[in-house]
C-alpha cells in the first residue's frame, strides 16, 4: 500500500527525498545537487510517497510558493521500479489538494518535454513557448486549482 506524507525540511526523510531526486532527475543527466539548493527549499512544501509495508520513500515532489495565488510544482520523481503505477499522478493530486487547502488557486510548472503528456493527463495545459534552462528543454504548464 502507498501512502502520501508531508516531509519536514532538514529531516532524515528530507535527506532521503534529496537522494531520490538526485538519483532519478539529476544523475542520469550528469547534473549535481548543490547544497545551495537546500537554502531555497526551506520554505517549500515537500511531499513524499512511501511504501507503507516497509516505510520506504518511493516518490516525492516539492511545492514552491510564487505569490499568494500561485504555487510551483517541482521535481516530481518516482523510484524507477514503481513508475507507471499511478504514483506520480497520485502525488500530483495530493499536492493539488494541499495547495488548495492553504489558499492557492493556480499551480504552474516547468515540464521536460518527455513529461508534457503526463501533465496534460493531470489537467495541466501548456502556456507560452518551449524554453531551455540549464541545457534542458521545458514547457511551461499551468493548472487552475
Predicted features, each with a name:
Residues 108-110, 125-140:
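Conserved catalytic-core motifs of GNAT/GCN5-like acyltransferases
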Residues 2-17:
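A short beta-loop-alpha structural element at the N-terminal edge
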Residues 65-74, 83, 133-138:
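A conserved beta-turn-beta hairpin within the catalytic core of GNAT-like acetyltransferases
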Residues 21-53:
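Active-site rim helix/loop that mediates acceptor-substrate recognition in acyltransferases
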Residues 48, 55-64, 70-77:
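Conserved beta-strand in the GNAT
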Residues 21, 119, 124:
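Conserved active-site tyrosine of GNAT-family acetyltransferases
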Residues 78, 84-97:
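Conserved acetyl-CoA-binding loop-helix of GNAT-fold acetyltransferases
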Amino acid at each position: 500500500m502507498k501512502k502520501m506524507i508531508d516531509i519536514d525540511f532538514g529531516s532524515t526523510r528530507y535527506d532521503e527525498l534529496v537522494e531520490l531526486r538526485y538519483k532519478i532527475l539529476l544523475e542520469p543527466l550528469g547534473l549535481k545537487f548543490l547544497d545551495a539548493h537546500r537554502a531555497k527549499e526551506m520554505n517549500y512544501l515537500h511531499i513524499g510517497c512511501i511504501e507503507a509495508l516497509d516505510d520506504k520513500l518511493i516518490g516525492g515532489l516539492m511545492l514552491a510558493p510564487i505569490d499568494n495565488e500561485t504555487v510551483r510544482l517541482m521535481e516530481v520523481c518516482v523510484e524507477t521500479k514503481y513508475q507507471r503505477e499511478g504514483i506520480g499522478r497520485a502525488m500530483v493530486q495530493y499536492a493539488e489538494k494541499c495547495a488548495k487547502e492553504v489558499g492557492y488557486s493556480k499551480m504552474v510548472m516547468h515540464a521536460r518535454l518527455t513529461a508534457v503528456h503526463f501533465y496534460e493527463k493531470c489537467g495541466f495545459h501548456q502556456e507560452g513557448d518551449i524554453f531551455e534552462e540549464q541545457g534542458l528543454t521545458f514547457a511551461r504548464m499551468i493548472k487552475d486549482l
